[in-house]
């Protein structure tokens, strides 16, 4: 599971993301949206007055850097970590970068309001687990097996 791969909806869903966005977008709207939103990475919205949502749940400990935006000419994209607001992007905001810490079970939620379009440019994760376990192994490797975690 790689939450960092935000190329498109299908890949993200396969990697554990959850989404409540419109799927059957008319071709002509899709063409216009592709031009404004850059189809190289994920973008999505809920057609009509309902709020579009995209969510991921983290499995480990670490820090993350998120680059996101709102590629619509109106509305907002808001970001929440564990249901607490951490950032938003207004109209025509192609890129905004934020950093945060996460733990197992932490949730990252995107909402689009007032006809905004959620744009996820990148999500870079730095999991501290591998460093922690390497350290534990190194400090215990000189001891007898009964002391190894």
Annotate each PLM feature.
Residues 110-117:
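Short beta-strand-plus-loop segments that form exposed binding edges in beta-rich domains
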Residues 58-65, 105:
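Extended extracellular/luminal ectodomain segments enriched in beta-structured repeat modules
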Residues 8-41:
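Extracellular glycan-recognition surfaces and repeat-rich motifs
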Residues 95-107:
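Short, surface-exposed tryptophan/glycine-enriched loops
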